[in-house]
């Protein structure tokens, strides 16, 4: 996204949001999980005061997890496929047009995309089926070590390319004029969405991991470690991609075009490009699979907490459901390409991404914050007690009003601005309809936070 939104100026705003918004929300999610020892299926039920309505967020949370995986499993499948394709030399000797055609051919092939999506789903649920200690902890730890090793090797190689320093300058020196040209609102919303997305906050995915945390460490310290690691991986990924693009005179952009068209073109021009390309997509595969496994664990835990299922049954049922639910995103590039839900040029994946990234992640974060700091939910005293339990950094005691008023206000303003920026070019009628939708979604969130419920 740094390439799309002007490089260092975007990164600076992203880091600000990460500290001021992302970190406090992550602490809130961890606190809810650790205090309840449950997923979002039951966490709010157990912690909310009598008559509160926060437990209804559990449904919104699970919808978010499913919708996210309905397209992310497909994207993770692309990563695995390209790791294989680069290693097997499928892209060797292809010019720019042929590389673009190769990616188009993948998207046109419903069978190939379905196969690799199924591989991702089965592999990830297989890890989760082993349980937390035997599967999740051991395998993700190995994956993270491999990921960090790969990212350092790839970044060092990228920085040694001729002309790479121009890319480093673009990446690390802010250009606010370029940001203004792109649109400050677009850049800010992109940075906000990225802060929520990279930390996986707002949908309840981190709540389940909070439920596995011990009481010996404070939650601010744990959250800070995760934020630093996440930021390191994100920034190092940029140091791999952007200097390499500048070294070979390729315009850095964003999205699938950058990863699956631009970068393979760069690798084709590079000495030993097949090896470096395979290593890059192996790194991307580890990164995407770690996200899939984390969200699948939340889905499994939700089913176990809500339905009382065994882990084995939760894995089998959700694996079958996920394969079926992921098919629309796959078919949206071929069989169902005529469906353009957000206007011309969009597809089913764009709609699913919009639902999660532009709606549930930011607004879900507001729900977690209000639950932890307001009188309508769990409350500030309970939150601080849980967050500060254990050794390590203590949560600032004087930021309650900031979290109660400022964080929700910032998120809501940028949320509405994001709708406006996205749909205003499509005309007043379309804009009006979608702004009404945004207000209805806000109303739903307001009902969850402030509504009263006599029965659960």
What kind of region is each of these model predictions?
Residues 1, 137, 141-289, 293, ...:
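Membrane-embedded translocation segments of transport machinery
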């Amino acid at each position: 996204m740094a390439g799309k939104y002007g490089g260092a100026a975007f990164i600076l705003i992203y880091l600000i949001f990460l500290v001021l918004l992302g970190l406090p929300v992550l602490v809130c999610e961890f606190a809810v999980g650790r205090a309840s020892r449950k997923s979002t299926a039951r966490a709010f039920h157990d912690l909310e005061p009598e008559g509160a309505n926060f437990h209804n967020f559990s449904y919104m949370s699970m919808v978010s997890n499913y919708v996210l995986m309905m397209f992310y499993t497909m994207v993770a499948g692309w990563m695995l496929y390209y790791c294989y394709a680069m290693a097997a030399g499928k892209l060797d000797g292809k010019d720019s047009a042929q590389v673009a055609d190769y990616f188009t051919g993948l998207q046109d092939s419903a069978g190939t995309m379905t196969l690799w999506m199924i591989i991702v789903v089965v592999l990830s649920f297989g890890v989760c089926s082993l349980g937390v200690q035997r599967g999740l902890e051991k395998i993700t730890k190995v994956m993270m070590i491999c990921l960090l090793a790969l990212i350092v090797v790839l970044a060092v190689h990228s920085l040694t390319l001729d002309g790479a320093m121009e890319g480093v300058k673009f990446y690390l020196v802010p250009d606010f004029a370029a940001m203004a040209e792109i649109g400050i609102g677009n850049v800010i919303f992109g940075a906000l969405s990225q802060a929520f997305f990279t930390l996986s906050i707002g949908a309840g995915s981190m709540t389940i991991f909070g439920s596995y945390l011990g009481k010996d460490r404070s939650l601010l310290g744990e959250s800070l470690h995760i934020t630093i690691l996440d930021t390191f991986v994100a920034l190092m990924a940029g140091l791999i991609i952007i200097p390499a693009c500048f070294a070979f005179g390729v315009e850095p952009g964003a999205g699938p075009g950058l990863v699956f068209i631009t970068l393979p073109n760069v690798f084709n021009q590079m000495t030993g490009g097949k090896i470096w390309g395979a290593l890059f997509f192996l790194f991307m595969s580890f990164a995407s699979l770690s996200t899939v496994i984390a969200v699948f664990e939340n889905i499994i835990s939700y089913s176990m907490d809500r339905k009382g299922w065994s882990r084995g049954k939760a894995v089998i049922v959700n694996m079958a459901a996920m394969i079926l639910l992921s098919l629309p995103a796959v078919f949206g590039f071929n069989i169902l390409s005529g469906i353009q839900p957000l206007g011309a040029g969009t597809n089913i994946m764009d709609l699913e991404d919009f639902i999660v990234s532009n709606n549930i992640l930011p607004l879900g974060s507001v729900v977690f914050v209000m639950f932890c700091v307001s009188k309508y939910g769990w409350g500030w005293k309970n939150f601080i007690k849980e967050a500060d339990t254990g050794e390590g950094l203590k949560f600032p005691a004087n930021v309650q009003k900031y979290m109660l008023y400022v964080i929700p206000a910032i998120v809501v303003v940028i949320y509405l601005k994001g709708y406006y920026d996205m749909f205003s070019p499509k005309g007043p009628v379309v804009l009006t309809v979608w702004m009404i939708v945004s207000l209805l979604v806000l109303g739903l969130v307001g009902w969850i936070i402030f509504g009263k419920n006599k029965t659960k």
